[in-house]
A protein has these predicted regions:
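ATP-binding N-terminal substructure of ATP-dependent carboxylate-amine bond-forming enzymes
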Residues: 1-123, 127-129, 133, 140, ...
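Active-site nucleotide/adenylate-binding loops and adjacent lid/helix of ATP-dependent enzymes
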Residues: 3-7, 19, 83-87, 125-211
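Hydrophobic beta-strand scaffold residues
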Residues: 35, 116-117, 145, 166, ...
Length: 340
């Protein structure tokens, strides 16, 4: 196959995207596919540029707002539609996280170009990126979610409606960027201001003590449940992308009944958002085994430490085969019209 990997982008998760792309490119080339790499900020990468950007580490903190502004100034001026390598591809593999690349904008452009691409369509991508809208759809589909408010919200309303502590996070952001665990009313405003650096809409969410679990979906089949035990109190940016900062177990050592319920909820959430190809759905499970769905990821990470490839491996799917399967799913799906 002729595969073009789209990566980078002007988002807080740019480094994560490159780390995912590095693994995907190596896996597909190991199967003798013709692979090119395009940074959606700067365009087609030559061999030297590719080696440079795909060899870096994610780091322990996301980029600053100033760095994001600089990336936006470097945004690709030539339309993706005019890149011959894009139009000549059998499939586009989206190694993108956050921003236009994951939130539906790029998907809408690719629908016009007419080249198959991995993951979900424009509408599903936009819904998954918006935590407020996606949680409303989960709840309507019968998937339990933590209670939440959208900022602004008064501390007394937080105490009454959610209780302390709470999670404050940007509504449309991933990798725990801009996320804070707030224990006291006097710390709420600072947490909201931090989250607002990354998105105009901020969610204040009930904190669920307990276990962190995740379920991948491939095609229309749930993968084995995984459990994450981070070294920090939360599964934050550093815990997600620094080797040794969290312990992941696939399959999770949980009761069969609980695992099946999590898989059922993951598939329901996947369908509620009309996600396609693959996704990962994250949960918290209370000490009483009450399940709460946090979010669905339409383009889960494919880095060395990412959860989705570990889930696939637990199902007997090696990483190169996983990448090929995702490409095949993309090539076999009907032309997108913003509804898949």
């Amino acid at each position: 196959m002729r595969v073009t990997v789209l990566t980078g982008g002007a988002t807080a998760e740019r480094a994560v995207a490159f780390a995912s792309a590095s693994q995907i490119v190596a896996a597909l080339r190991s199967r003798d596919h013709d692979v090119h790499v395009v940074d959606t900020c700067t365009g087609l990468l030559d061999d030297a540029e590719e080696a440079n950007v795909l060899s870096g580490n994610v780091g322990t903190t996301p980029p600053s707002v100033a760095e994001l502004d600089e990336q936006e100034r470097k945004m690709l001026s030539e339309s993706l539609a005019e890149l011959a390598v894009v139009r000549g591809s059998d499939v586009l593999f989206l190694a993108l996280h956050g921003g236009a690349g994951e939130g539906g904008t790029l998907q809408a452009i690719l629908d016009v170009i007419g080249v198959p691409y991995t993951g979900s369509g424009q509408l599903a991508s936009a819904l998954a990126m918006d935590k407020d809208l996606s949680k409303r759809l989960f709840r309507a589909a019968g998937v339990p979610v933590p209670a939440w408010f959208m900022s602004p919200v008064a501390p007394e309303d937080v105490k009454t409606g959610l209780g302390w502590p709470v999670i404050v996070k940007p509504s449309k952001q991933g990798s725990s960027v801009g996320l804070t665990l707030v224990r006291k009313p006097q710390d709420l405003d600072a947490a909201v201001q931090l989250a607002r650096r990354y998105d105009d809409e901020v969610m204040v969410e009930q904190f669920i003590p307990g276990r962190e679990l995740t379920v991948g979906v491939l095609g229309d089949v749930p993968l084995p449940v995984g459990e994450i035990v981070p070294k920090h109190e939360l599964f934050d940016y550093e815990s997600k992308y620094t080797p040794g900062m969290s312990e992941e177990t696939f399959p999770a050592k949980i009761a069969t009944r609980l695992a099946r319920q999590l898989q059922e909820y993951a598939l329901t959430a996947h369908r509620a958002l009309k996600l396609g190809g693959y996704s990962r759905v994250d949960f918290r499970v209370s000490p009483d085994d009450d399940i709460f769905c946090l979010e669905a990821n339409s383009l889960p990470g494919f880095t060395r430490t990412s959860l989705y490839p570990q889930a696939a491996l637990a199902a007997g799917i090696e990483f190169p085969e996983l990448c090929e399967r995702i490409c095949t799913l993309a090539r076999n799906k009907r032309p997108a019209r913003g509804d898949n």
